[in-house]
Regions:
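Core alpha/beta nucleotide-donor-binding catalytic domains of modification enzymes
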Residues: 1-215, 244
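AMP-forming adenylation/ATP pyrophosphatase catalytic core
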Residues: 2-33, 50-54, 86-88, 106, ...
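Short, surface-exposed, polar/charged, turn-prone segments marking secondary-structure boundaries
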Residues: 78-81, 109-112, 158-162, 198-199, ...
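Alpha-helix boundary/capping and short turn/kink residues
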Residues: 150, 154, 179, 218-222, ...
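Internal, active-site/partner-interface "lid" segment
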Residues: 200-206, 227-236
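Conserved anion/nucleotide-ligand pocket segment
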Residues: 211-212, 216-228
């Protein structure tokens, strides 16, 4: 049974860090039973709320009816509300996606915007802004069954999370409450709501499971919903244990040097036949489960072989796999002054101009550069090297392709990819941390020196 008291108890158990008193809640309200019930519960608790209703304009007069119902409902409870209408079908066609995906993108983008507006409106207050949705136990069971039949891992079988906090903070306080319990609560408080006729159509997989499959299952297993929820709870506990074990395993095989994460291939091969270990590591780098076999093949590939995702590259180098962000080769930073600091992906560059006569002994380590300041024209540009770059390495009188120069240093592909250069127009002054250009070195005629130091190397 759903009561105000047990709802509050569940809240304090599930969301101990989210104060009902010091949080502003954005309520996603369709006008259906579930969102009306949740809204009324928050109203009875005296929580600070704003109602948000999205009119997707997909059901003609019924969509208009829902919008009017939510408007009247919000006014009756004296809760601030926002309504927005979207051309969902046109959005789906423009971006070549299904209606359900389009509706999801539209509503969460708008919710994100509203939450930022609410946060701005409350000013210096420390109150959190949290989105509440009315997903309930029946939704949870449907989701788990859909994941199971599609094929999934342990995480997929844990269903809908009680909360998530990525781009926006979302809580689902009714996940442990069945639709029948919400219906009884609504009846007790004489709450009215609207029915979405599309829920009766079996055009979507979820509706088929809800309308056709679950009733048959419940004829055989009367406690099916409760049993699935209990199983989900146990699987969530098991997932924590599995994740901790996987994290500990990879921690033993990983090192970070010069900002490059490297994994021992010998260590990886201990679990090569266990896809769960590999997936536990690679999923956060943009891989898909279908790529696990491809990643395993990389362990025995030739030096320099790699697999790329939209965010990272996994590169084979000797007895390691190196993990490099894809954006590491896009750095471009203008340098406008002759003195000061410049933060780069490879470390901090410190610039200073000194009198050649008073400079003292030069430090010959590679992370120091001494250039003839009178030959320098500002601004300079710090960027990642390119395949078309060339320069005159210190000590040589002829130009050399930078690609060939870096190749002679026997650098790993990951480190080579991240090398930065300091340029003046189309002239390369310094391969940072490696070699300056001979044309800009100090000479006996040098009066002023631009000294550059690479500090805090990544």
């Amino acid at each position: 049974m759903l009561t105000l008291e047990n709802f509050k108890e569940q809240w304090e158990r599930k969301f101990p860090d989210i104060s009902l008193k010091h949080t502003h809640f954005l309520l996603a309200v369709s006008g259906g039973l579930d969102s009306v019930g949740l809204t009324y519960l928050m109203h009875l608790l005296g929580a600070k709320c704003t109602i948000a209703h999205v009119n997707f304009q997909l059901r003609g007069e019924e969509s208009k009816r829902d919008e009017q119902f939510v408007t009247d409902f919000a006014n009756r409870l004296q809760i601030p509300f926002k309504v927005n209408r979207f051309e969902t079908a046109a959005y789906a066609e423009t971006y070549k996606m299904g209606i359900q995906q389009a509706a999801r993108e539209i509503r969460y983008a708008w919710f994100d915007q509203l939450m930022k507006e609410i946060k701005t409106s409350i000013g210096d207050s420390n109150d959190k802004v949290v989105l509440l949705t009315a997903h309930h136990a029946d939704d949870q069971v449907e989701t788990v069954l859909m994941q199971l039949f599609r094929g999934t891992g342990l995480h997929g079988l844990t269903g809908i999370p009680d909360f998530r906090n990525d781009s926006i903070f979302v809580c689902r306080p009714l996940l442990g409450t069945t639709k029948n319990q919400i219906r009884q609560f609504a009846k007790e408080y004489s709450l009215t709501f609207v029915e979405d006729s599309s829920n009766e159509k079996n055009d979507y997989t979820r509706n088929l499971i809800r309308n056709k499959l679950l009733p048959v299952i419940q004829e055989v297993y009367a406690q099916a919903t409760e049993n699935v929820l209990d199983t989900v709870a146990r699987l969530k506990e098991a997932e924590v244990i599995v994740n901790n074990t996987i994290t500990a395993f990879w921690k033993k095989g990983k090192k970070t040097r010069h900002g490059i994460e490297t994994i021992s291939i010998q260590h990886w091969k201990k679990v090569k036949d266990n896809h769960t270990y590999t997936w536990g590591f690679i999923q956060s780098y943009g891989f898909k489960p279908q790529q696990i076999v491809e990643v395993h093949k990389l362990l025995d590939a030739s030096n320099g072989a790699y697999i790329a995702t939209p965010t990272h590259r996994f590169i084979k180098f000797n007895d390691t796999i190196q993990v490099v962000p894809n954006n590491s080769n896009t750095e471009h930073i203008m340098v406008y002054v002759g003195e000061g600091d410049l933060q780069t992906n490879n470390g901090l560059l410190h610039f200073e101009t000194v009198d050649a006569a008073n400079m003292g002994e030069m430090n010959k380590e590679a992370h120091f550069a001494y250039l003839d300041a009178d030959k320098i024209e500002w601004p300079l540009l710090y960027r990642t090297w390119q395949s078309t770059d060339y320069f005159y390495p210190l000590g040589l009188r002829k130009k050399k392709k930078l690609n060939h120069f870096l190749g002679s240093l026997k650098l790993s592909p990951a480190i080579k990819q991240r090398i930065g250069v300091l340029t003046m127009g189309d002239k390369l002054l310094w391969v940072v941390g490696k070699r300056i250009d001979d044309r800009y070195k100090m000479t006996d005629q040098t009066k002023s020196v631009l000294k550059i130091t690479l500090l805090d190397r990544c």
